[in-house]
Amino acid sequence: LSEELYIKMNARGLQLSPFDNFKADLTNFISNNAYEGFKQMVPLYKKDSSYEVEFNFNFSVKLDAKWIDIFWKKGFENFDAAYMSFFSRFFAIKYILASKDTVSDRDMRQDAILRKLYTDAEDRADMNEYLGFQEFEQLLSSHPEYIMTLDKVFDVFYEHDYKDSKKTIFKQLLPY
């Protein structure tokens, strides 16, 4: 658990939610990973800011200060669980796509990693329980670029009023 998160949560007087633990693990993973993309200098997410920071720091800021609004503004009663479900589903889909050539559809239904990334993670979110970051770390260690894609997806969802044109969102989500 990062010192920053510990201080923030103690200041609020709340026990860490499963999603708070997940965010801490995810941001620690990104900060401590040698992937070149995580060290890139990017504009700091903040209105009218001219500062540049490393991607890993900016991701952490957007995780807490920007993207949460996607779920909060939609009126989810438990927006932490909705946010966590998005992560679980996103990484499960990325895992399925990465494994489709080596794992049959039948075997995929029984796949232990997929079960932990998606089914078990969804159940744990509903029960307000956190059992760790191991499966996410295993996937992201092999595919750190998934974080870059996730960053792009969240930014597009946040910036775009998707009621107007689904085609625009689709074009913005195409891979680099």
Predicted regions and their residues:
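Flexible coil/loop and intrinsically disordered segments
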Residues: 1-176
